[in-house]
A protein has these predicted regions:
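Gly/Gly-Pro- and Ser/Thr-rich, intrinsically disordered tail segments characteristic of DNA damage-repair
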Residues: 1-292, 447-505
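DNA-contacting surface of Y-family translesion DNA polymerases
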Residues: 8, 229, 237-415
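Short, charged/polar surface micro-motifs in flexible loops or helix N-caps
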Residues: 12-14, 38-42, 351-356, 425-428
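Acidic, metal-coordinating catalytic segment for phosphate/diphosphate chemistry
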Residues: 18, 373-505
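Composition- and surface-driven signal marking solvent-exposed, interaction-prone regions
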Residues: 80, 343, 360-363, 433-437, ...
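A glycine-rich phosphate-binding loop feature that marks nucleotide/adenosyl-phosphate handling sites
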Residues: 184-187, 282-284, 341-353, 414-427, ...
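Short, well-ordered secondary-structure micro-motifs
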Residues: 191-192, 357-360, 430-433
């Protein structure tokens, strides 16, 4: 088997860099954070510029954490300043370093998701000048994997120089710089980029390129901590590993070699993580068998569409019911646009922390409690599903979901998150071609709920009306035609129709 060479490229603080470029500012020296401050200071920042991160700010903080970190940093600067006094402030790191009497200031840029998508398309077009689409996997809006194997010999170039060529061309055309990782498999390329490159000193353009193979990975990173720095190891995985005395990738690799009679062996890992232990063990050794062609040929066994939103404030039960109704309407629209049907819809309701901090609500709740990622106690989410007829009109879906909502929701609690998903997707053409199989044991059949001719005509009329609505929205935008309920206080559809990924377009 031919040895492969993969390159992973991550655009540096992408959203923040784009906002700096659009303002004519240097992305590497400007203090800027991308956040919608209209959502209060609790809103999550989508990006923080590299210069602002230097003051102890993480990549995805909440806005109040940025405010606090800058305030603390300015207090230290004031203490060290001449006469313990700051005479002004600046948003530029270079000027700040040369002027001890200045304080730290920063720009707050509201998200512009459509602009970021446009920049991402421009970057991808640069890659396509050098690489075939079959050799590129778009991992996210700002990150790609490239199988560079066949290009290196043809161009008589090293992987490092090829990565630099791509990054510098992107920089020249868009102003956005990047970090790259090179590896003998996809996992090592990702780890080289995420861990090794980001610890390197950047060049004058902010570019970092790191390279790993299986042996150098074991030498450099078997003792690395924390485990959460590694791809696919989240807080839950790391906590479970550390609770069992496994703190590093080297620990996991050694554990996988243990004898059956020893406490630490691969059986321990399989008991902890099930079949996922196989991937964890491979990654501990720097092994990844998935190749680019495997990604391109992958087809999921079951397809689904998910809609989710975090409400800007805690909602009472009645108010959140309207949002569930709207989200189901939006889901029906997506199914129609994509010519799909489903036979099952799932609903998950996440509750707000105030449900447990307000005594008048807490006294009414006696259910399970979980701890969120910030260490706060939150009521256990409610979850349920309902079956629906394939091709059912929007009103049928909306009635089914609101009934499900009324069934599973705790009416005493405040709601913060809502997620719905359409399961078992199938193309309309496939559904229409399949004969409907009668089920003697179906509740609907037994209850005699087969539609009458008049009901069927009404349903077909509603479907035709919905098709017209879909056509109008596709031509003139999702807010071109709305339901009256979308204007009720607490409704979110009008606002969300102007968003991409839950943020301002």
């Amino acid at each position: 088997m031919t040895n492969r060479t993969y390159i992973a490229i991550d655009l540096k603080s992408f959203y923040a860099s784009v906002e700096c470029i659009e303002r004519g500012l240097n992305p590497l020296t400007t203090h800027l954070v991308v956040a919608d401050e209209s959502r209060t200071t609790k809103t999550i920042c989508l990006a923080v510029s590299p210069a602002l991160k230097m003051h102890g700010i993480g990549g995805r903080p909440r806005l109040f954490e940025v405010v606090r970190a800058v305030r603390d940093a300015n207090a230290k600067r004031k203490y060290r300043a001449p006469q313990h006094r700051l005479t002004g402030e600046t948003t530029d790191a270079t000027e700040l370093a040369a002027s001890p009497h200045l304080g730290i200031a920063y720009h707050i840029a509201p998200p512009r998701m459509a602009l970021y998508v446009a920049y991402s398309v421009r970057v991808y077009e640069v890659y396509l000048r050098h690489i075939a689409p079959a050799d590129i996997h778009i991992y996210s809006i700002d990150e790609v994997f490239i199988d560079a194997t066949s290009y290196l010999d043809t161009l008589h170039i090293s992987a490092h120089d090829f990565a630099l060529r791509l990054i510098r061309e992107v920089l020249q055309e868009t102003g956005v710089t990047a970090t790259a990782g090179i590896g003998t498999n996809l996992y090592l390329a990702k780890i080289a980029m995420d861990i090794v490159a980001k610890r390197m000193k950047p060049d004058a353009d902010g570019v970092r390129v790191a390279q790993l193979d299986e042996l150098s990975y074991r030498h450099a990173l078997w003792a690395h901590r924390p485990l959460t720095d590694f791809w696919r190891i989240g807080r839950g995985y790391a906590a479970k590993l550390e609770a069992n005395g496994l703190y590093t990738m080297g620990d996991i690799a050694r554990c996988s070699l243990g004898k059956a009679s020893e406490h630490y062996n691969e059986d321990l890992l399989y008991r902890l993580f099930g079949v996922q232990a196989e991937l964890l063990i491979d990654h501990a050794w720097g092994i990844e068998t998935t190749r680019m062609e495997d990604i391109k040929h992958y087809r999921p066994k079951s397809r689904s569409i998910h809609h989710g939103q975090v409400l800007q404030m805690p909602y009472a039960t009645d108010k959140a019911r309207l949002v569930v109704w709207e989200m189901t309407d939006a889901l029906a629209h997506d199914l129609a646009v994509k010519h799909l049907t489903c036979d099952r819809i799932e609903l998950t309701i996440g509750y707000d922390v105030e449900s447990l901090t307000r005594p008048e609500i807490r006294s009414l709740y006696h259910g399970r409690i979980r701890t969120d990622r910030y260490g706060r106690s939150v009521p256990w989410p409610s979850h349920g599903h309902c079956t629906v007829e394939r091709g059912a009109p929007p009103r049928t879906l909306m009635n089914a979901l609101t009934h499900l909502y009324d069934t599973i929701v705790n009416p005493h609690l405040l709601i913060r998150r809502i997620t719905i998903s359409a399961q078992h997707l199938r193309a309309i053409e496939q559904h229409s071609a399949d004969a409907k199989q009668l089920d003697l044991f179906s509740a609907d059949e037994a209850a005699g709920t087969v539609l009458t001719e008049e009901e069927r005509r009404a349903q077909e009329k509603e479907k035709a009306l919905h098709a017209a609505v879909v056509a109008i929205k596709q031509a003139y935008g999702k807010n071109a035609i709305l339901r009256g309920a979308n204007f009720i206080d607490g409704a979110t559809m009008r606002q969300r129709n102007g968003q991409i990924g839950g943020h301002k377009a």
